[in-house]
Amino acid sequence: MGVRYTNRAITTEQQIDILKERGLLIDDVERAVKALDIISYFRLAGYWRHFEADHTTHQFREGCRFADIIDLYSFDKQLRALLFTAIQTIEVAVRTKIIKHFALEFGAFWFMDENFATNEARFATNLAVIRKEVERSHDDFITEHFRKYNEPELPPVWKTLEVISMGTLSKLYSNFSNATAKHAVAREFGLNHHKFFRSWLECLAVLRNCCAHHSRLSNRVFPVKPKMPERMPNTWIADFSFREQTLYPQLCFVYWLNSIVLENTFITDFKQLLISHPSVKTRLLGFPRNWEQEPL
């Protein structure tokens, strides 16, 4: 059983004193105060945990500098922006491909028909969430639809799927009963089986939320492991010794999915980001030792 929390709020200057007492080197106290006033102590704490020698006493390793923590934070912030840009492209394409392949064969309202679901309970849950997400939408094409039509209760799939969340979209795809249609969508992204695409969509929804809510990516353990095919039709990875719940495999599949657009500069942009932040260690992202020798 836990104990009552009794700590009081302290000033930014007092926070700086605590960090100094724990062995962190702070060259410019004034800049450090400004940084903490903008970023906040506990948001940065997730980044400096890697620099601690002891996670119980929170003593820092010898030679650790506040500037290195800020550099890691800055790298992480820019990486989120890079990923979010790629995910936006992927997300729009996924919606379009699912609408295209499912609607032509299964109609405009397949998402409301439990005959197209593998699990009835998940179908009911998904539909309830879709209703709420559509109700919350203020997009012109949704409000205009309801102004004109009152049946069925929801707009057709080519409107509805544009306003549901990435997580809901992932669950809809996963619970769809027709494997042939799911394969068709997966093949649009260069995958030979929908099980990989289903897994990647689930991971993508989590990763998207991390980026959208400014959550830390480096040194993070993700809740879902992406299924990684050993062979692909184009250049892919050969070393699968990485830790599955780190960012590295997610970066790999984001690059692959983003290849649906011709101007895919994701790897080039990522490498440039690493060059701009030489103090950042790729092992914090789960990269294998010889990642630069990978075909991808």
Question: What are the language-model segments listed below?
Answer:
Residues 1-206, 218-296:
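Extended intrinsically disordered or low-complexity regions, especially N/C-terminal cytosolic tails and loops
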Residues 214:
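Acidic/aromatic/glycine-rich contiguous surface patches that form carbohydrate-binding/processing clefts
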